[in-house]
Amino acid sequence: MTKFEAKRIYEDLSNDDGYRVLVDKLWPRGVSKEKANLDEWCKEVAPSNELRTWFSHDPNKFLEFKEKYLEELRNNKDLKEILSRWNKKDKVILLYGTRNKDCNQAVVLLEYIKQVV
């Protein structure tokens, strides 16, 4: 069974990171492609531009953001194929750029994956 975790892309690489997937729409500032050491940049699972802009990483909006993002995930036609691909890996790290480790799309995506997988 695949193990999924969320991790900030600015954290140091770990030998046990597994398959590293950036789940942001935008490339994180100050991170080179070499430093990111990505296996995949999956913009398809990131929140829509409208939702991302509205949320603007405001913790006061997180609960509403979570609800809206979960709705986007439920309606995402590509997600089934993406999860099927990820489920072939031993470990998948969902990478995000924001500083807030508790209020971000990777946390919501991780929760969603754990419910549907």
What are these regions (language model features)?
Residues M1-V117:
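Residues lining hydrophobic/aromatic ligand-binding pockets adjacent to catalytic sites
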